[in-house]
Every structure is written in structure tokens, then in C-alpha cells.
Amino acid sequence: MGSSSIVELLEAYPIPEEKEIPPYKIYCDMDGVLTDFQKRFEHFTGMLPKAYENKYGIAGFWNLIDVEVGIKFWSDMDWMPEGKRLWNFIEKYNPDLLTSPSKDDSSRLGKKLWVKENLTPLPNVIFSY
């Protein structure tokens, strides 16, 4: 080592530097991630959502959810089997919920009620159309 300069040693054996960890934002979906959409749908129809849509069409599918059941379809959903575990893990990172409502206002209202009843502190809810 005698004749090597410090600069040469650092170039030959670079030391990884800790870099500032960039801030990340976690977005978590509701339907099928936190809430069990399929189970809720089957509760009212006895059918899988896709089978119901194939039989009654997309208009019949959304009519059942938005008109016949309404807000309660969304507000009374069960958690997905691992939904609470996921939420308990990510909540410390201040996640936002990202969800797609139906065209009817009952969906947005029902989802907001579900969040209010099930999540504390209340996360920001972003509706994506």
C-alpha cells in the first residue's frame, strides 16, 4: 500500500454512500384489496359478478348495485381475508386509498362510509374514474 495514494485507493475500492431515501407514496385500492367486492356481490345475487353480468348485461349489473342495493352495497362490505393485515402494515406510511366508483353517487358515498367506519386515522380517498 505504500505508494498508493488515498485517491487511488478510493477509486479502486469505492465505498457505497448512503443516499437520502426518496419519499414514496403508497396508494392502496379498496375493491378486491381491502374490501371483498365479490363476496358482497354474491351475498345479493348468489352469483359471481362476471356470471351475473353475462346473464343480465352490464346495465343489469350496475342497476343491482347502484339502484336496488345502493349505498349499503359499498358501506357494508367485509374486509378481504388479508385486508386488515395489509392495512395495519401500510397505515404508518400514510397511504392514500385509490378507488374507482360507479357512475352513481351511491358508490362514492358508500365507500366513504366504509372508510369512516373501518379506518383510523382517516386516509385520503382518491376516486379514479
Task: Provide a role label for each language-model segment.
Residues 5-68:
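Active-site neighborhood of HAD-like aspartate-dependent phosphohydrolases
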Residues 63-73, 96-97:
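Glycine-/proline-rich flexible loop or hinge segments
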Residues 15-17, 85-86, 127-129:
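Short, flexible, glycine/charge-rich loop motifs used to bind or transfer phosphoryl groups or to couple energy/partner
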Residues 21-23, 92-94, 122:
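A general structural motif
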Residues 74-78, 83-111, 115:
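Substrate-recognition element of Asp-dependent hydrolases with the DxDx(T/V) motif
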Residues 118-129:
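Donor nucleotide-activated moiety binding/catalytic core segment of transferases
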Residues 45, 90, 118-119:
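Hydrophobic, Leu/Ile/Phe/Ala-enriched alpha-helical segments that form helix-helix packing faces
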